[in-house]
UniProtKB/Swiss-Prot annotation:
Family under the similarity heading: Belongs to the pyridoxamine 5'-phosphate oxidase family.
Binding residues annotated for substrate, in chain numbering: 14-17, 73, 130, 134, 138, 199-201
UniProt cross-references to SUPFAM superfamilies, sorted A to Z: FMN-binding split barrel
Any single biological process term in GO: pyridoxine biosynthetic process
Requisite cofactors: FMN
Record gene name: pdxH
Known function: Catalyzes the oxidation of either pyridoxine 5'-phosphate (PNP) or pyridoxamine 5'-phosphate (PMP) into pyridoxal 5'-phosphate (PLP).
Keyword field: Flavoprotein, FMN, Oxidoreductase, Pyridoxine biosynthesis
Enzyme class label: oxidoreductase
Naturally occurring in which organism (per UniProt): Salinispora arenicola (strain CNS-205)
Domain of life of the organism encoding this protein: Bacteria
Protein name: Pyridoxine/pyridoxamine 5'-phosphate oxidase
Amino acid sequence: MDVTGDTVPPANLRNEYAADLGLTESNLAGDWYTQFDRWFTEVVAAGLPEPNAMVLGTADRAGRPSARTVLLKGYDPDGFVLFTNYGSHKGTELAANPYASLVFPWFMLQRQVVVTGRVDRLDRAETEAYFASRPRGSQLGAWASEQSRVLPNRSALDDAYRAMAERYADGVPIPAPPNWGGFRLRPDGVEFWQGQASRLHDRLRFRSTDGGDWVVERLAP
């Protein structure tokens, strides 16, 4: 293919990493949750846009993968929380194959976190509590959008939103849709990546063993 113009070949793009502080076994926290909390706090303080954006990877029963960017809505020692329409592409894949991965691409700080694990639905009380905290426009949007369904045009979505706005007019409380809710990814592996010079990056992974303990492993970059 003859490509002309100002296109820059991806192979010519270079970025040298030179972290002031490497990631070592001595400065790593004692557990994945504390380490993630430390880095997440630093990302927020640094003012990165959408610091809670993460790439969610799923696969169907046949092993065909898909990925998309979603927003982290909570984390604790039990795992990472997100919300979606259960009938969406990711929702149906998680129902069929309840294992997933998360990637937090914090490249402005020369960092990345990769998480793998099993995914469970949140109980209804947790979903409803979070839904009640959402802006009203987002609540209406959850009712209006049959996520991942093919639409004939943009007007169909706008019309559905207006219909929901009329249905719940005058400040009527908006309940969580029955097909909308949360998932918690319970990690069995959490890798922390810190960029370093000469592509000799630091990769330290917390991995859950069959016995339920956690071990720390250094991975080759």
